[in-house]
Design a protein with these regions (language model features):
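Short loop/turn motifs that initiate or flank beta-strands
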Residues: 1-198
Length: 198
């Protein structure tokens, strides 16, 4: 800092603080200077303070990690339930108005472990534009098999010398209109006449 008009040898010191007009990203932003002067000879001067200056505030990098997807039972869809309770926002300035939401889809609807879930991120809040955000793009989760319930009924028959049985098998618990084809080979416990035979 140059002091025009300062007499050589005088005891005079100046310190300065500055404040931007606001905290947000921008170029050529006004910085208001607040001076403080000390020294034995300060009272000998009528001081014209430094004019305000300009400077830039650039975007801050923000890296997102730790978003997870919940395992699920097969339901015929690729939709994943996301969990951001353990998300980490590296570079976030505490107190900023910033909110994040996430949706996810499995690579396919089929049963499997460690399946890739693609993450779609959405951010809101007054301070979002102050960040250059590197999204978390994927995670993994499992799809487990859905249980089906089988019911069976055997047909009565007239003694024919064999233990062969005719059984009708019914399955319930399918997703939507899905079905499977099933076959069975069934026999009575023996070939003889009886009631309530296994």
């Amino acid at each position: 800092v140059a002091y025009s008009g300062l007499v050589d040898g005088d005891t005079f010191n100046g310190t300065y603080t500055g404040a931007f007009s606001d905290k947000n990203v921008g170029t050529g932003k006004t910085v208001t200077i607040t001076p403080s002067y000390t020294g034995a000879d300060v009272s000998n001067y009528s001081i014209t303070n430094h004019a305000d200056v300009t400077a830039n505030i650039t975007v801050r990098s923000l890296n997102v990690s730790g978003v997870t997807a919940s395992d699920k039972t097969y339901d015929g869809s690729v939709t994943a339930t996301m969990n951001s309770s353990s998300a980490v926002y590296s570079g976030f300035v505490s107190g900023d108005d910033f909110a994040a939401s996430y949706s996810g889809v499995f690579a396919d609807a089929n049963v499997g472990t460690g399946k890739t879930v693609t993450i779609t991120s959405s951010y809101a809040g007054a301070d979002v534009s102050n960040y250059n955000i590197t999204d978390q793009t994927s995670t993994t989760a499992d799809i487990s098999a859905k249980a089906l319930t089988a019911t069976a009924s055997a047909s009565n028959k007239v003694y024919d010398g064999s233990s062969a049985a005719t059984v009708t098998l019914s399955l319930s618990g399918f997703v939507g209109s899905e079905t499977v084809t099933s076959t069975n080979s069934s026999t009575f416990s023996d070939k003889n006449v009886g009631t309530g035979k296994t």
